[in-house]
Protein backbone atom coordinates (compact mmCIF):
# COMPACT_ATOMS: atom_id res chain seq x y z
CA UNK A 1 0.00 0.00 0.00
CA UNK A 2 1.13 3.53 -0.76
CA UNK A 3 2.30 5.25 2.42
CA UNK A 4 0.63 8.44 3.68
CA UNK A 5 2.84 11.12 5.21
CA UNK A 6 0.82 14.05 6.55
CA UNK A 7 2.29 17.53 6.23
CA UNK A 8 1.54 19.43 9.46
CA UNK A 9 2.61 22.89 8.26
CA UNK A 10 -0.97 24.18 8.30
CA UNK A 11 -1.34 23.30 11.98
CA UNK A 12 1.69 25.48 12.70
CA UNK A 13 0.30 28.25 10.47
CA UNK A 14 -2.88 28.39 12.53
CA UNK A 15 -0.91 28.38 15.78
CA UNK A 16 1.43 31.13 14.61
CA UNK A 17 -1.44 33.33 13.43
CA UNK A 18 -2.39 33.89 17.07
CA UNK A 19 0.82 33.08 18.92
CA UNK A 20 1.07 30.72 21.85
CA UNK A 21 0.97 26.94 21.60
CA UNK A 22 -2.50 26.14 20.24
CA UNK A 23 -3.20 24.14 18.22
CA UNK A 24 -0.41 21.82 19.32
CA UNK A 25 1.64 20.43 16.43
CA UNK A 26 2.78 17.55 18.63
CA UNK A 27 -0.63 16.52 19.93
CA UNK A 28 -2.22 16.65 16.49
CA UNK A 29 0.73 14.77 14.97
CA UNK A 30 0.08 12.06 17.54
CA UNK A 31 -3.59 11.95 16.54
CA UNK A 32 -2.60 11.74 12.88
CA UNK A 33 -0.31 8.78 13.52
CA UNK A 34 -2.79 7.09 15.85
CA UNK A 35 -5.32 7.38 13.01
CA UNK A 36 -3.08 5.27 10.79
CA UNK A 37 -0.87 7.68 8.85
CA UNK A 38 2.58 6.31 8.10
CA UNK A 39 4.57 9.45 8.79
CA UNK A 40 4.81 13.17 9.40
CA UNK A 41 6.16 15.75 6.94
CA UNK A 42 7.32 19.30 7.67
CA UNK A 43 8.70 22.04 5.43
CA UNK A 44 10.53 24.50 7.70
CA UNK A 45 11.05 27.66 5.66
CA UNK A 46 13.71 30.21 6.52
CA UNK A 47 11.13 32.79 7.66
CA UNK A 48 9.54 30.25 10.05
CA UNK A 49 6.08 31.37 8.99
CA UNK A 50 4.72 27.96 9.95
CA UNK A 51 7.07 25.19 11.11
CA UNK A 52 9.90 26.52 13.28
CA UNK A 53 13.30 25.08 14.09
CA UNK A 54 11.95 24.28 17.55
CA UNK A 55 9.08 22.33 15.96
CA UNK A 56 11.55 20.29 13.93
CA UNK A 57 13.44 19.10 16.99
CA UNK A 58 10.35 18.62 19.14
CA UNK A 59 8.87 16.41 16.43
CA UNK A 60 12.16 14.51 16.22
CA UNK A 61 11.96 13.67 19.93
CA UNK A 62 8.24 12.94 19.77
CA UNK A 63 8.69 10.48 16.91
CA UNK A 64 11.59 8.80 18.68
CA UNK A 65 9.52 8.06 21.76
CA UNK A 66 6.38 7.26 19.73
CA UNK A 67 8.30 4.72 17.65
CA UNK A 68 9.86 3.14 20.72
CA UNK A 69 6.36 2.55 22.06
CA UNK A 70 4.70 1.19 18.92
CA UNK A 71 7.54 -1.03 17.71
CA UNK A 72 7.38 -2.91 21.02
CA UNK A 73 3.78 -3.68 20.07
CA UNK A 74 4.81 -4.98 16.66
CA UNK A 75 3.61 -1.87 14.81
CA UNK A 76 5.77 -0.56 11.98
CA UNK A 77 7.89 2.52 12.61
CA UNK A 78 6.47 5.89 11.56
CA UNK A 79 8.69 8.05 9.34
CA UNK A 80 9.82 11.64 9.62
CA UNK A 81 10.20 13.57 6.36
CA UNK A 82 11.71 17.06 6.29
CA UNK A 83 11.38 19.16 3.12
CA UNK A 84 13.43 22.18 2.21
CA UNK A 85 15.65 24.06 -0.20
CA UNK A 86 19.24 22.90 -0.89
CA UNK A 87 20.99 25.37 1.42
CA UNK A 88 23.47 25.32 4.28
CA UNK A 89 20.65 26.31 6.63
CA UNK A 90 18.55 23.32 5.62
CA UNK A 91 21.50 20.93 5.56
CA UNK A 92 22.45 21.89 9.10
CA UNK A 93 18.86 21.32 10.24
CA UNK A 94 18.63 17.90 8.58
CA UNK A 95 21.97 16.67 9.90
CA UNK A 96 20.91 17.59 13.44
CA UNK A 97 17.32 16.32 13.25
CA UNK A 98 18.24 13.11 11.37
CA UNK A 99 14.86 12.38 9.75
CA UNK A 100 14.17 9.19 7.84
CA UNK A 101 13.90 11.18 4.62
CA UNK A 102 15.01 14.60 3.42
CA UNK A 103 13.09 15.93 0.43
CA UNK A 104 14.96 18.66 -1.42
CA UNK A 105 12.70 21.24 -3.02
CA UNK A 106 13.56 24.26 -5.20
CA UNK A 107 12.38 27.45 -3.52
CA UNK A 108 11.69 30.86 -5.08
CA UNK A 109 11.83 34.01 -2.94
CA UNK A 110 8.37 35.05 -1.83
CA UNK A 111 6.55 31.92 -2.96
CA UNK A 112 3.50 30.85 -0.96
CA UNK A 113 4.02 27.17 -1.63
CA UNK A 114 6.27 24.94 -3.74
CA UNK A 115 5.15 25.16 -7.36
CA UNK A 116 7.85 23.54 -9.51
CA UNK A 117 10.44 20.80 -9.56
CA UNK A 118 14.19 20.99 -10.06
CA UNK A 119 15.34 22.02 -13.54
CA UNK A 120 18.57 20.24 -14.49
CA UNK A 121 18.85 22.10 -17.79
CA UNK A 122 20.57 24.69 -15.60
CA UNK A 123 23.95 23.11 -14.84
CA UNK A 124 24.14 24.98 -11.54
CA UNK A 125 21.34 22.78 -10.23
CA UNK A 126 23.52 19.65 -10.22
CA UNK A 127 26.55 21.39 -8.71
CA UNK A 128 24.40 22.95 -5.98
CA UNK A 129 22.69 19.70 -5.08
CA UNK A 130 25.68 17.35 -5.21
CA UNK A 131 27.40 18.28 -1.91
CA UNK A 132 24.06 18.60 -0.11
CA UNK A 133 22.88 15.16 -1.22
CA UNK A 134 26.23 13.57 -0.40
CA UNK A 135 26.29 15.06 3.10
CA UNK A 136 22.76 13.86 3.85
CA UNK A 137 23.32 10.38 2.43
CA UNK A 138 26.53 10.05 4.45
CA UNK A 139 24.37 10.19 7.60
CA UNK A 140 22.17 7.36 6.35
CA UNK A 141 19.24 9.64 5.56
CA UNK A 142 17.20 8.85 2.45
CA UNK A 143 17.09 11.67 -0.11
CA UNK A 144 14.19 12.52 -2.41
CA UNK A 145 14.13 15.31 -5.02
CA UNK A 146 11.03 17.30 -5.96
CA UNK A 147 10.60 16.77 -9.71
CA UNK A 148 8.15 17.32 -12.54
CA UNK A 149 7.02 14.72 -15.07
CA UNK A 150 9.67 15.54 -17.68
CA UNK A 151 11.89 12.50 -17.09
CA UNK A 152 14.69 13.70 -19.40
CA UNK A 153 16.93 14.50 -16.45
CA UNK A 154 15.99 11.72 -14.06
CA UNK A 155 19.39 10.20 -14.74
CA UNK A 156 20.85 13.29 -13.04
CA UNK A 157 18.89 12.41 -9.91
CA UNK A 158 20.53 8.99 -9.96
CA UNK A 159 23.96 10.54 -10.55
CA UNK A 160 23.47 12.71 -7.49
CA UNK A 161 22.86 9.65 -5.35
CA UNK A 162 19.24 10.41 -4.44
CA UNK A 163 17.03 7.38 -3.95
CA UNK A 164 13.61 8.82 -4.72
CA UNK A 165 11.80 11.53 -6.59
CA UNK A 166 8.68 13.29 -5.38
CA UNK A 167 6.47 14.09 -8.33
CA UNK A 168 4.95 17.58 -8.15
CA UNK A 169 1.24 16.86 -8.58
CA UNK A 170 -0.02 20.44 -8.78
CA UNK A 171 -0.73 20.32 -12.55
CA UNK A 172 -2.65 17.05 -12.17
CA UNK A 173 -4.70 18.32 -9.23
CA UNK A 174 -5.53 21.61 -10.93
CA UNK A 175 -6.60 19.78 -14.11
CA UNK A 176 -8.72 17.38 -12.06
CA UNK A 177 -10.40 20.35 -10.36
CA UNK A 178 -11.64 21.40 -13.81
CA UNK A 179 -12.90 17.93 -14.64
CA UNK A 180 -12.02 14.31 -13.95
CA UNK A 181 -11.51 13.83 -17.68
CA UNK A 182 -8.87 16.56 -17.83
CA UNK A 183 -7.20 15.08 -14.78
CA UNK A 184 -7.04 11.65 -16.39
CA UNK A 185 -5.55 13.16 -19.55
CA UNK A 186 -2.60 14.69 -17.68
CA UNK A 187 -2.30 11.61 -15.45
CA UNK A 188 -0.72 9.77 -18.38
CA UNK A 189 2.32 12.06 -18.05
CA UNK A 190 2.72 10.92 -14.44
CA UNK A 191 2.39 7.29 -15.44
CA UNK A 192 5.22 7.62 -17.96
CA UNK A 193 7.36 9.51 -15.46
CA UNK A 194 6.88 6.86 -12.77
CA UNK A 195 7.73 4.05 -15.17
CA UNK A 196 10.90 5.79 -16.34
CA UNK A 197 11.93 6.56 -12.76
CA UNK A 198 11.48 2.92 -11.82
CA UNK A 199 13.65 1.83 -14.76
CA UNK A 200 16.44 3.95 -13.29
CA UNK A 201 16.01 2.43 -9.85
CA UNK A 202 14.29 5.46 -8.33
CA UNK A 203 11.36 5.04 -5.96
CA UNK A 204 8.44 7.40 -6.52
CA UNK A 205 6.77 9.73 -4.02
CA UNK A 206 4.19 12.37 -4.92
CA UNK A 207 2.56 15.41 -3.44
CA UNK A 208 0.76 18.74 -3.84
CA UNK A 209 -3.00 19.30 -3.72
CA UNK A 210 -3.89 15.62 -3.64
CA UNK A 211 -7.23 14.82 -2.02
CA UNK A 212 -9.70 11.97 -1.64
CA UNK A 213 -11.33 12.82 -4.98
CA UNK A 214 -8.30 12.99 -7.26
CA UNK A 215 -6.53 10.17 -5.40
CA UNK A 216 -9.15 7.79 -6.80
CA UNK A 217 -7.21 8.23 -10.01
CA UNK A 218 -3.73 9.05 -8.76
CA UNK A 219 -3.53 6.07 -6.40
CA UNK A 220 -3.28 3.93 -9.55
CA UNK A 221 0.13 5.40 -10.37
CA UNK A 222 2.67 2.62 -10.98
CA UNK A 223 5.36 2.26 -8.31
CA UNK A 224 3.84 4.94 -6.06
CA UNK A 225 5.64 4.55 -2.75
CA UNK A 226 4.41 7.53 -0.72
CA UNK A 227 2.21 10.59 -0.89
CA UNK A 228 2.81 13.69 1.21
CA UNK A 229 -0.39 15.64 1.79
CA UNK A 230 -1.08 18.72 3.87
CA UNK A 231 -3.28 21.60 2.75
CA UNK A 232 -6.27 19.73 1.34
CA UNK A 233 -6.21 17.10 4.05
CA UNK A 234 -6.27 19.82 6.71
CA UNK A 235 -9.05 21.67 4.87
CA UNK A 236 -11.18 18.52 4.78
CA UNK A 237 -10.47 17.87 8.46
CA UNK A 238 -12.18 21.17 9.36
CA UNK A 239 -15.40 19.57 8.12
CA UNK A 240 -14.96 15.89 8.92
CA UNK A 241 -12.49 15.90 11.81
CA UNK A 242 -8.82 14.95 11.63
CA UNK A 243 -9.13 11.26 12.51
CA UNK A 244 -11.94 10.63 10.03
CA UNK A 245 -10.10 12.54 7.31
CA UNK A 246 -6.83 10.65 7.73
CA UNK A 247 -8.72 7.36 7.61
CA UNK A 248 -10.57 8.42 4.46
CA UNK A 249 -7.26 9.17 2.73
CA UNK A 250 -5.90 5.81 3.83
CA UNK A 251 -8.98 4.06 2.48
CA UNK A 252 -8.59 5.63 -0.96
CA UNK A 253 -4.90 4.75 -1.03
CA UNK A 254 -5.61 1.17 0.02
CA UNK A 255 -7.96 0.68 -2.91
CA UNK A 256 -5.21 1.49 -5.38
CA UNK A 257 -5.90 -0.22 -8.68
CA UNK A 258 -9.32 -1.33 -7.46
CA UNK A 259 -10.64 2.21 -7.90
CA UNK A 260 -12.11 3.31 -11.18
Swiss-Prot record:
This is Pyridoxine 5'-phosphate synthase. Pfam families: PdxJ (PF03740). Keywords: Cytoplasm, Pyridoxine biosynthesis, Transferase. GO terms for biological process: pyridoxine biosynthetic process. The gene is pdxJ. The active site is at residues 43, 83, 208. Pathway: Cofactor biosynthesis; pyridoxine 5'-phosphate biosynthesis; pyridoxine 5'-phosphate from D-erythrose 4-phosphate: step 5/5. HAMAP family: PdxJ. 3-amino-2-oxopropyl phosphate binds at residues 7, 18, 209, 230-231. It catalyses: 3-amino-2-oxopropyl phosphate + 1-deoxy-D-xylulose 5-phosphate = pyridoxine 5'-phosphate + phosphate + 2 H2O + H(+). It is an enzyme of class 2 (transferase). Belongs to the PNP synthase family. It comes from the Bacteria. InterPro entries: Aldolase_TIM, PyrdxlP_synth_PdxJ, Pyridoxine-5'_phos_synth. The record marks 166 as: Transition state stabilizer.
